[in-house]
Amino acid sequence: MRIHIVGSGPTGMSIAWELLKTKEHEVIIYDRKKNAGGSWWEPEGNKRDIHAHRIVFGNAYRNTNDLFNQMGISWNEMFEPVDSRVYTTILKYLNPKDYAALSSLAVRVLSNQNKYKSITLKDAIGELSETGKSAISTLTLIMDGVTWDIMSAYEFVKSFDHVGLSKQYTQRVSGKIMSDKMKKELVKKGAIFKFNAELINVEYGKDEYVGIFEDGSRINDGMLIMAIDNGKAINLVKNNWGEDIQKKIGPSTYGCINILFDYDEEIYLQKTDLEYAMETEFKIQPVVLSDRKTVSCVICDLTEEILTTDPDTLKTKVFEQLNVPKPLDIRIGWGCNWENGKLIHSGLQSSQ
């Protein structure tokens, strides 16, 4: 069977690999960008230009480790440990009342998982101390880029294991390195990549579909898999999943802005990203990138104030809130566009 996969991010390429292993399918992968990577994609250039830095968990990512082994990719070549100290930071802010609330939540979630998949962490966790509330409500931003009134209690309990029991890593050099290696191995397996190809509409029949790309080309055979972010998926899935599509996948969609600080010498942050997120008005999550001279400052909680702040003012406010040494340059990562003084695109992602 011919299988069309729209989206060449890690998800789309992982699906393609599993399908190609069967040796029963022709796999074609499409992406609107110039190369593979999805939200991990980075443009060419001397400076890092990323949508957002990524935190991954070594012991928890068993499927990724297995996939890398099959592809001949070394985990340690792709990722390097980060000094985030998130777990010790959490412990500093919790008291016995908070431990009791977390323990109760874990028992309730694990004994009735389906129920708590539809209840937010904020509604399920119960009473917390002021410091515990600040830590837990901010931790969800570090875990998955969403606030605690969006993350489900089930997702929090399962994800908390990753944070507490697994060493944290970020991209070594850049996410482009991983994307290029995965693409190379897929091509060896027979995958066909088509870039600068944006799917803009899907028409659904009873047992058929027509996918329409921006250049007017169409696909209508075999199977269509959309490995794309939820924000884009909502417009393409339409009512094919029922009338409540917005309710099903809308809440797990988030955007982010990444402000990049460039230095001419190595920089060290005095606090963890969790502490900065707890203490700054914009809940900024800063991490020093692998070159040790670039700080990636991600903002996921996009309030109306942030959305209506012009780029130059936003850069100034982020610098002032972090209280770090003055950088040589302050840039905004790809995926953000402003129109009439308001952010109109912030690189929509999925938290699932």
What is the predicted role of each segment?
Residues 20-44:
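Glycine-rich FAD pyrophosphate-binding loop
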